[in-house]
Amino acid sequence: MYAFHPDSGELLWKFDCNPKNAVYKLGGRGTANDFVATPVIYDDKLYISVGQDPEHDTGVGHLYCIDITKQATREDKDVSPTLVVATEPELKEEPNPDSALIWHYGGPATADNPSPTQETYYFGRSMSTCAIQDDILYVAELGGHVHCLDAQTGDLYWTENMFSNTWSSPYLVDNKVFIGNDDGILYVFEHSKELNILGEIYHDDGTKIRATPVAANGRLYYLTESPTKLWVIEDGAQAAADGN
């Protein structure tokens, strides 16, 4: 992740969102990830999840909270959590005194740090852009788990398994969180530190919801795939006779 001065283009800082021992391998077999999601700025902090091509399937992912006000003192402007100081005979890293990391969520699960989703990793590869309001953050991983965290500390409030992959991002509006999945189900959660599923909207034609919903003028809009349709939901409205 790079931050530049908007007027001069000067590099302000850079932050490595992969562990130093992560490696790229074809077909998703590696541990290094890419950016598929969009960074979100909230309260002078940057939030970003990492993942891979969804065709690479699930795997270890990470979610970072970065201090965007950090003043980098190093010549290379590196504000990553650690710095590599040797590669031979083995990789050696040390804490970076310039680190802009506020908190990190993810990585492999361990006995001391068991996964809240019962997976072998704490947070999976993600294509999801975070949604944040009232210091409450929502993010999803490719494998279909929705996570709700404290945006300031990274502490977990709750998770929910949608039992289907999701390419979608949570959309927060009117104190509700909307997100779709590959089973064609649009989930509606209450914006809350407590898990409360307000509803599930089903499509029984084998379609997928991969785009992120959007709301305007009291209506919710979202796309489905295979077949491609645009759906519009309005409070109190009745579905058309043909379902379109």
Where is each model-derived feature located?
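Noncatalytic, solvent-exposed loop/strand surfaces
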Residues: M1-N244
